Structures are given as structure tokens and as C-alpha cells.
Swiss-Prot record:
The protein's name in its UniProt record: Small ribosomal subunit protein uS14
InterPro entries the record matches: Ribosomal_uS14, Ribosomal_uS14_bac/plastid
GO MF term (any one): rRNA binding
Sorted UniProt keywords: Ribonucleoprotein, Ribosomal protein, RNA-binding, rRNA-binding
Source species taxonomy: Bacteria, Bacillati, Actinomycetota, Actinomycetes, Mycobacteriales
Biological source species: Corynebacterium efficiens (strain DSM 44549 / YS-314 / AJ 12310 / JCM 11189 / NBRC 100395)
Length: 101
């Protein structure tokens, strides 16, 4: 079980990312565009640097939906490998069966 503060901080980061996502995309498009003037590109870079660090998507950590475990995360289920195995054995995941060959 992850600390509640870590889970809360990650949720806060998700909210910040959502708030700044549109503006960040606009600024990055300006920076990448080869037809942009050097002055506009520099202004866009400065504005991007002024935004909070937590506005970047890469700072959000994928965590287990049940207990917040940060490692062994399976995107398809939104769970860690440990929790996915437990729930699959109990039959709580529809369409998931134990493999046999």
C-alpha cells in the first residue's frame, strides 16, 4: 500500500497536467514549427519554462487503482500485477482466465 500522500500528490499532478495541457501543446507546436520566427520561438520557450514542472505529463506516475502501488502496473486493467492476479483468481475480472497449455 502506497502512502496516502504519494497517491494524493499524483492526483494533484494529474489535475495540473489537465489544466495546462492545451496551452503546453500550443507552445510546443510553436517551438517545433520550422516557419516560426526566432523571436516567437524564444518567447514560447520562455513561457513553457515559466509553467509549473508538474504541468508535464511525464511527471505523472501510473499507479494501481486499488492501493496505489507504483510498480508492476498493467495499463489494460489499471492494476498492479499483484492485484490483477488476486482479482483474476477470485473471478472479479471478466474475460480473464488462468492460462493452460
Amino acid at each position: 500500500m502506497a502512502k496516502k500522500s504519494k497517491i494524493a500528490k499524483n492526483e494533484q499532478r494529474k489535475a495540473i497536467v489537465a489544466r495546462y495541457a492545451e496551452r503546453r501543446a500550443e507552445l510546443k507546436a510553436i517551438i517545433r514549427n520550422p516557419n516560426t520566427s526566432d523571436e516567437d520561438r524564444l518567447d514560447a520557450q520562455f513561457e513553457l519554462n515559466r509553467q509549473p514542472r508538474d504541468a508535464a505529463q511525464v511527471r505523472v506516475r501510473n499507479r494501481d487503482a486499488h492501493d496505489g502501488r507504483p510498480r508492476g502496473y498493467l495499463r489494460k486493467f489499471g492494476l498492479s500485477r499483484v492485484r490483477m492476479r488476486e482479482m483474476a483468481h477470485r473471478g472479479e475480472l471478466p474475460g480473464v482466465r488462468k492460462s493452460s497449455w
